[in-house]
């Protein structure tokens, strides 16, 4: 696998968390949260992020239940992934994002308690968790 830059996305109907990571260290950092309206992303902002980072691939979290059932957001996340590929002609990989938001909230709580848990930060850190999971699995 090439040792380039990758972008991770935590899709949501109101917000999409974004993270950037690299293969060399198998680590990721939260970037930002992009607003969405009823599941429709701000494609101009996504374009700017992709242009700025020039990633080799895009990683999208796929929400599922603990018992492998799909959630109401699963098909929307798949559609988002297909649109990313269609619009930007980059490889897109789906990753099981089960419990990524719980892990992100736990991380923020450790950093400063409930006052540190802001929805936008949770989304970008969840994207970070998703991307790191993919980087480690694809080694």
Curated annotation (Swiss-Prot):
The keyword Cytoplasm applies. Gene3D superfamilies: YqgF/RNase H-like domain. GO terms for molecular function: nuclease activity. InterPro entries: RNaseH-like_sf, YqgF, YqgF/RNaseH-like_dom, YqgF/RNaseH-like_dom_sf. It is an enzyme of class 3 (hydrolase). GO terms for biological process: rRNA 5'-end processing. It is found in: Cytoplasm. GO terms for cellular component: cytosol. Keywords: Cytoplasm, Hydrolase, Nuclease, Ribosome biogenesis. The keyword Nuclease applies. It holds the Pfam family RuvX. Its EC number is 3.1.-.-. Could be a nuclease involved in processing of the 5'-end of pre-16S rRNA. Belongs to the YqgF nuclease family. This is Putative pre-16S rRNA nuclease.
């Amino acid at each position: 696998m090439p040792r380039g830059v990758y972008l991770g996305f935590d899709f949501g109907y109101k917000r999409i968390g974004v993270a950037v990571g690299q293969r060399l260290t198998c680590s990721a950092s939260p970037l930002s949260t992009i607003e969405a309206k009823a599941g429709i992303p701000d494609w101009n902002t996504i374009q700017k992020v992709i242009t700025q980072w020039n990633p080799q691939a895009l990683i999208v979290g796929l929400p599922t239940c603990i018992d492998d059932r799909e959630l109401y957001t699963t098909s929307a996340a798949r559609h988002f992934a297909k649109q990313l590929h269609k619009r930007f002609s980059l490889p897109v990989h789906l990753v099981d994002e089960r419990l990524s938001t719980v892990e992100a909230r736990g991380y923020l709580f450790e950093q400063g308690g409930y006052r540190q848990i802001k929805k936008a930060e949770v989304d970008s850190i969840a994207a970070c968790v998703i991307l790191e999971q993919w980087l480690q699995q694809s080694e």
